[in-house]
Amino acid sequence: GYADWNSGFVNVHRGEVWKVTADFGVNFKEAEFYSFIESNVLNHAVAGRNHTVSAMTHVRLFDSDYTFFGKIYGQWDNSWGDDLDMFYGAGYLGWSGSWGFFKPYIGLHNQSGDYVSQKYGQTSGWNGYVIGWTAAYNFNLFGEDFVLSDWNEIELDRNDAYTEQQFGRNGLNGGLTLAWKFYPRWKATVTYRYFANKLGYDGYGDQMIYMVGYSF
């Protein structure tokens, strides 16, 4: 796929990015699991590339729609440094159907990173709270199948060192995606990637991502 940091509503001056992504998901009666891995900045030398791995699960509690929620989100950057976010908390799976789904969660935030503040020390350790969700809406337009989806996380009360690194006590991280299933197993997607005081950026920023994918 192709991404451009400079073509959203905010020009964050990070240029163009070529990327490769693979994802996997499975649903059981008792639990569900989703993960992805992506390699970014493939149009740059190895020293400027980065990689992201994420894994998320909901495990139902006592056959109810309430869940134990867990997630890891790791970024390994050859120039900026490494960062691993770990969330543990509770979620809900009761809002779903043929129309799509809305799956909220809330949790504690534990962080492991390379950044060391001269004033506050390491970012690693307790890092506040997270409120988030994943959502999708399925619809048909002009005889074509589309999915509008969103993932969103609000980070609250982050530690002093991470606040210094990310330019704020609270932060926002997410992406709004429109997917067109234009052929069996093939889809094209456009994602509006948004963030605030996250990804090492001061204030609100965004990115446009264009992908073509195949489902196995």
Language-model features and meaning:
Residues 204-216:
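Outer-membrane beta-barrel "beta-signal"
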Residues 33-37, 51-55, 152, 172-176:
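One face of beta-strands
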Residues 30-35, 62-70, 98-104, 140-149, ...:
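Repeated loop/turn-to-beta-strand initiation elements of outer-membrane beta-barrel proteins
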Residues 2-5, 28, 39-43, 72-78, ...:
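Transmembrane beta-strands of outer-membrane beta-barrel pores
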Residues 1-43:
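Short glycine/proline- and aromatic-enriched beta-strand/turn motifs that initiate or cap beta-hairpins
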Residues 23, 54-58, 89-94, 132-136, ...:
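Outer-membrane beta-barrel architecture
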Residues 109-187, 194, 214-216:
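Outer-membrane beta-barrel transmembrane domain signature
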Residues 13-16, 39-132, 203:
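Outer-membrane pore/translocation modules
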